């Protein structure tokens, strides 16, 4: 399982923080973190693909709907903590349950208290910056691969599988 401390990653890295809007006093239903969360979901989905069961945990306090149900987007489970509960405690609880069940867990957060709490056998800890570095490296590698492919000419025979 991959557990991501959502707002910690957003606040700790310019990649996502730059996507956050200023809160608007004229609109109570404006969500300043919508774009940042959407990009984070896409990045986590790409990072986790085929390797992890990804979960992003957000603090529910202060959200427009503090009783949000668990959601899923692009194969990533989104969990908002309940009113009065922190995302940190949700992450700690999920990591403890996974570890007790003998499953490996990777926790992404730059919160040192969370990192210390989830430390133990079967738990890998990565900083928020490490996730962003991995995502940006993957994007760069994909761009290079795409550019390399676009420079070569392909014939119909090149596109056919040898078994055909």
Predicted features along the sequence, with ranges:
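Nuclease catalytic cores that cleave nucleic-acid phosphodiester bonds
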Residues: 2-4, 8-164
């Amino acid at each position: 399982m991959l557990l991501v401390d959502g707002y910690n990653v957003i606040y700790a890295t310019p990649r996502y923080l730059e996507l956050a809007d200023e809160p608007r006093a004229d609109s109570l239903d404006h969500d300043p973190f919508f774009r940042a969360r959407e990009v984070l979901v896409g990045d986590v989905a790409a990072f986790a693909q085929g390797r992890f069961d990804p979960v992003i945990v957000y603090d529910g306090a202060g959200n427009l709907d503090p009783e949000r149900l668990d959601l899923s987007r692009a194969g990533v489970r989104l969990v908002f903590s309940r009113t009065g509960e922190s995302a940190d405690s949700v992450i700690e609880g999920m990591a403890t349950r996974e570890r007790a069940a003998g499953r490996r867990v990777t926790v992404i957060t730059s919160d040192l208290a969370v990192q210390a709490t989830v430390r133990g056998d079967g738990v890998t800890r990565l900083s928020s910056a490490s996730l962003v570095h991995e995502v940006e490296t993957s994007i760069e590698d994909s761009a290079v691969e795409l550019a390399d492919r676009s420079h070569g000419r392909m014939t119909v025979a090149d596109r056919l599988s040898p078994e055909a």
